[in-house]
Amino acid sequence: AEMIEKRHRIEDALEAVKAAQQEGIVPGGGVALVRALPKKAGSTAEQIVYEAVKEPIRQMARNAGESPDLILEQVQKEEGSRGYNFATGKMGDLLEEGVIDPVKVTITALTMAASAAGTLLTTGYAIIEGE
């Protein structure tokens, strides 16, 4: 079972490298998604996507034992590739520090968020799992 897990991790890493080579990289740690946001969301669909793309950085903060709202606020004050490095616990230039995501992965995340927003808008009722 452990060997299978290691194999899957290696395969995932290889796919990420291929994706990065094909389409490039962006700052990781959820920063590229936050930077893609407009300053304010307008329509209901935009509001859903607006909140959805903030969730990866919030989850990483929770996983690191940090305050999701505080980390998100700090990252939103920064510009470019500056963000919170969860490995060091400090703000920094994530591209320089090697905290990166393939563009393809980031685009997929935005596409999925938009798809979820569309589904929610066309659904009469939804059961939402609370925290």
Language-model segments: what does each one mean?
Residues 1-131:
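Extended, low-charge hydrophobic alpha-helical regions
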